[in-house]
Amino acid sequence: MQNSDDLLGAALAAPARSPAHATRLGGRELGGQIQSWKVERAYSTDLPEALRAFSGSASAQLELLLGGSGVPAPLLYSAWAGRGTGDVVRPGQSVVHRAGANGRTVPAFRGTVRSRTAASGSNTVTVQALDGAERLRGPAQLPRPYHGLRYGRPVATATWCVDELLRQGGIHSCPPPRAPAVAEDPAKPFTVLYASLHGGFNSSYGQPETLPAPAAYSWIRDGAPFETALMPKAAGLEVSWMPRSRFVVAGKVFQAELHVNTALSVGSELELKLVFDRSAGAFGNYALNVYFATGVVKITSGTVGGGGTVASWTFPKLASLKGVWHLGFTVDTRAGAVGGSTPAAVYPRLTAPDGVYLPAAPFTFTQAAALQPPSELSQVDLTTDVAVECLQVTDRSWPDGDSYTADEWEQKGRWTKGAVLDDATVPLFDLPTVAGSQWDAITEIARATLSTAEFDEQGVFRWRGPARFQSVPERPDLTVTTRRDIAALTVSEEIDACRNYCEQTYQDWTGISHTFSDTVTDTVVREIRPGASVEVAYAVAEDELDIGPPQIEDDIAPMTGHRVRFGSAATGGTSVKGGVTVGSRRDGPNYIVRFTNHGTASVWTVTKDGKPSVQIVPQKRTGDPRRRTYAWYNTTSQAHYGKQVYQAPATDWVQQRQVASDLSYAMLNAGRYPVPVLGDVEVLHDPRIQLGDVVRVVDTSGAALDTLAWVVGIRTTCAAGAAPQQTLTLRGTSYNGVPSDTGLVPDPPVDPEYGTTRTYSLIEAQHATLAVLTDSGVTYRELLRGSGGAAA
């Protein structure tokens, strides 16, 4: 239920009440012009009605009848009305509706106008609005890396996919990517890696590079910095990602960051490392090391597996104050030049659990061991002992290091949390292909995983997994009785609500890995001028998985496979390293590569012998998964109701036997006995009731029941000057016990007399003549049912 103040609670409990509402369109209060309003919410699913609380999506609808103010409403608000008045109800306009009693209201609806209809000659305009689902009408697309197949380990979960689809629609559950869009200006900020860690290592931008074993970690919600966090089960959990842009090290400001909860730990250290690909197969790095026990923060610049220089700071608060910290570091390499060794100034960035930003003086690396030769970002490594959420790396994050503000670090005013998730369930090795809108994809996931998706009255998206309805609550959110609250009540029980044999299909990915697809070799040597960017689109097949940017080859250590070489001349020249940023992204059937030259001279995509050097090597899976099924059943229920089967539709979202078992058992637990549905429950209007609430229904007049039920549908209507009417659809939290049939002897399904009638040939064999039959004195009924065998 929604929270409310004592005054509203008292108003709703009083014998008499005065209805109240407030309605804003486009931020303008129009409640006084509302002739009537109606709000409807219900779970939508393809399951039997009595089971519909267990999966599907809920999209709320608001209908308003709007009158004019001094002039007819159509003149003000029709599609052809002047923009000065008509825009307040145009399609896409914001709508906020509140309802209550005695002047106190709570949120009832938040969404956008979908349509307006003006009846000419009347004083009424009908406005229909939908909730936040309208914000998710953009095309759905999920990143599909090959690494889950490569390691045979889950790369994401259904929860992660929902969170990613929400993010695409601008609905966030944690700080968003700082600069997700590809800008024409190569000097603009750009997010090269963003991993929410909301139930998966898959990343919105970039790709996983290595995956830990599932036994080494868990996904937690309690104590997560924002929503869901990666929690190691032992110290030193390692995971790494590939950026979507291999940016050059010199001449810019870039940063890496994450959020942690130091109160949830299995050790006291964390390392976040940016690895850069140098020439001749060597690698350099900038690494942030945090020691929570001592409050020491170190930043290292050096060579992977070799020497380097370490800068150190001490923050006593880091050791003394446990909780959610925002940690990271900024690297300023503007003093370096493309093609030369690069010095850097580094800045640790910390925000404490109390919201205080901890400033620190920069440290400048000038020692020879700390200078970075020409190179490009290759990999991002994380090693952690604490709970981690929302990791991202931003190229060109700020013009300089010194003017960077605490508000910019915290992205203040740039995002609002608009989603609440559930436990990360339904692991995925290979992300299914999605189609349609983001809302369509979320609905598909909800139905496939017995989850629910909805926007509440405040416009917050809520995702609840299959465990939501499996435990009966101890006490209700509200009690309604026929003595005071209930005006009408219909209780129904149907055999269609009984499902005592539940079967779930799943995909078996055992033995399936990834392999190279058909190599695509460029046909043109491309010139990239200084300061310019060149984009090239290469066709990829629908069944091919996502790949990262090509690796950058140099002449000292030639490579094969997915790569590109930049030459100093169109005929080949010498290889150029650390001068060109290479990024990639997938857009439907196209794999788009972007080259940006940061040097002072043109370079060409050319091999040493003068041929085009861009070589794209797509990835695909080695085969298709096998379809298998898992079923749970209940023989006691089958004895009373017969076998009632539910076969879940085959879906790509169930990829483990255990998940299939969990889902089929959840459905069996919900439907092994038909649970009563309380339909058309007309109650006194209570604006606090929400979908999923538990209501205690006490009927002392008709059905004589006292039971708990979940709210799975709400319809509220109100006309000006009248009391609101609220109708609930409820699903019982449990069934009314196992049938006992006391004192009953149920008739068998087949008439016992069928097949017992004697045939003519049998009667003829027992009576030689008609006279013998007549003399026997047997009646006709006795003749047909007598002993001597059954009918043929």
Model-predicted regions and their roles:
Residues 1-401, 425, 429-435, 439-450, ...:
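Assembly/oligomerization scaffold segments
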Residues 658-672:
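Stable alpha-helical structural segments in soluble proteins, enriched in small hydrophobic residues
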Residues 413-431:
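Short, conserved helix/loop micro-motifs enriched in His/Cys and acidic residues
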Residues 3-17, 175-218, 223, 247, ...:
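Surface-exposed fibrous attachment elements
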Residues 161-165, 402-416:
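Short, charged, amphipathic alpha-helices and their helix-cap/turn boundaries
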Residues 1-9, 20-22, 120-151, 283, ...:
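Acidic, low-complexity/disordered segments
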Residues 446-447, 451-479:
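Extended amphipathic alpha-helical segments with heptad-repeat/coiled-coil character used for oligomerization
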